[in-house]
Amino acid sequence: MKKILLATVFGLTAFSAQAQEKVADSRSTTPMADMTNPFYITERGFMLDSRIGYGREKLNASINAPVRQTGYPFLTNAHSLKASETLTYGITGTWAVYGSLGYDWTKKYGASSFNEWDWTIGTKINTIEDVWRVQIGADVTWSDYSKWKKVKNEERKDTHLYLMAGTETGENVFGYTRLDYHTVDFGSDRQFDSYDITGALHITPSGTTTADVGLRFGWDTLKGARSRDLTFLLGGYLSVYKNMALGLNADYVLASSNNIKGYGSPDNQGAYSLEFNVKYEF
């Protein structure tokens, strides 16, 4: 799958260079003009995306945790507060670069807490035909963790590729599918891959409101865990100005399984997150 993603990325990048002139004339009359559409890239301008959220995590086997406080040597049954700021610059209207800074404060009930800082740089490009929209992107995230009761989590690097394709499936309805691939390196010699497949609908019931609803299936290759999650996604935006939108997004893990052995072993079913964000274009 990694080779397929890489080949697709290079092929679509070459095609996009030929398609950009055609896009410029049609962009104002397509769903791409909707700044909340997942394919939207601002034309020769900036977009700021500010997010703050709360989440309940049932299992993250890649995070080391004190055994006395969790019952396992990894993170279980915790809640977190997250905040991030992402700045995107649209270079041509179909190609953009972006960078973000994020902070995550995580605490297990009745136990101590730890925090994490993230830095991300990336790029994305749209390849557009008459009916289908296609976006490819790549980014790298570096994460730094504080100690948790003398338990250390190594700094990690997450290299991410994605491919997204969508088309209008009805009046005011835009359907899309997304494939994500991550390869995560941490510690001196530890590494695992993760994959996500998402199917969703972007709905525009009015000129000022939009909504997204979908499902995501994800799995990883982390040794000893190999988690598999099915997650329900729901979100909505209200455009308060032509260049500003307020959003509320939520997700909930409907089903989860893994290869962790033992009676009553944990999984991620029932995990959820709720996030508020503001998009501002300038």
Question: Which residues make up each language-model segment?
Answer:
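Outer-membrane beta-barrel architecture
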Residues: 38, 49, 86, 122-124, ...
